[in-house]
Design a protein with these regions (language model features):
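Gly/Ser-rich catalytic/binding loops embedded in alpha/beta enzyme cores
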Residues: 2-142
Length: 142
């Protein structure tokens, strides 16, 4: 277990990986562990793609963020084979047929996408309270 995980941003995690102080698998395991503990409290990650993320671990070796866990916003971001709902019940079964350019760039940079985050319906409000997945709570104000 990597207890200091929450003290690092993506750049800091990439630096630890580059120095081989931790492995991509260990980082992903910690991200999954933290998600399983915290998400029931805040409801931020309705789509968990842990198995898909494990497949991504060997991709893009040598990329600047190779092995850094990453969450993709479920708002106009397509990752082939996953639901792209945009926070709407209208799209709750919309499986992406392709991976969009921005998501490809994240993957090309070596980021490991392990889930999609909750979003307001079509991004139309400033708070995340969609009917589809329910509200996301402020982690600093539980």
């Amino acid at each position: 277990m990597f207890k200091e995980y929450k003290n690092f941003d993506a750049t800091g995690l990439a630096e630890l990986l580059e120095k081989k102080e931790i492995t991509p698998g260990e980082l992903l395991d910690e991200a999954i562990f933290q998600t399983e503990i915290l998400d029931p409290l805040i409801n931020a990650i309705p789509q968990k793609h842990f198995d898909l993320a494990k497949q991504q671990l060997e991709n893009k070796l040598g990329s600047p963020f190779h092995g850094v866990p990453f969450l993709l916003k479920d708002l106009h971001a397509s990752l082939k084979g996953t639901i792209t709902s945009d926070g709407s019940r209208l799209n709750e079964k919309n499986v992406a047929k392709f991976t969009d350019t921005l998501t490809h760039r994240c993957l090309d940079a070596g980021l490991v996408i392990f889930g999609k985050t909750n979003s307001p319906e079509f991004g139309l409000t400033v708070t995340t309270e969609p009917i589809l997945h329910g509200p996301t709570r402020n982690p600093w104000n539980l």
